[in-house]
Amino acid sequence: MKKVLVYVEGQTEETFVRDVLDPHLSLQGIYLKPILARTKRTRSGTVFKGGILSYKQVRRDVLRLLEDSSAVQVTTMMDYYGLPDDFPGKAEVPVGTPYQRVAFLEDAFRRDIDHPRFLPFLTLHEFEALLFAQPEQIVQAFSDPPKAASQLVEEVSRLSPEEINEGNDTHPAARILRYLPG
């Protein structure tokens, strides 16, 4: 079985890698191990996980993962939306399609890490946007859905993926937390 370490930015991505991708790829002899981004460690040793605060943190974590010689590949699953300002290439992103901008940043990331086993992956739209592919499924996920779930579905049903993914207060995770906190 070939081990691939997947550096993920949040719990949603971690769950997706563990519960969806890994079982599927294990049939082909590939074991995916999600590694959740660490945001800080206190003096007492408590580690806080989830979220990308700086590229310095990402770089340190990815280089540490590459020290695991039992992994055939190290990759990432991070949202293009909200990358930190110090991310490689972010200040020089060319005008072009969103796909071209993502490809440019992935290449800058790959060149900065500069390791043959590193394959960066940035998701163009926040991963949580997949939850809105069939918004009515959000309500069906609850045995006793709160009224807020229906309000969320009504709101996002009128929007395109680009509109759902726009801004600090309107990106998918923010919308979900606003209607369904906790």
What are these regions (language model features)?
Residues M1, E14-G45, K56-G182:
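C-terminal accessory helical subdomains adjacent to catalytic cores in phosphodiester-
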Residues G50-G51, Y55:
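Non-catalytic terminal and connector segments of soluble metabolic enzymes
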Residues V6-T15:
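Catalytic nucleophile-elbow at a beta strand-turn-alpha helix junction centered on a G-D-S/GDSL motif
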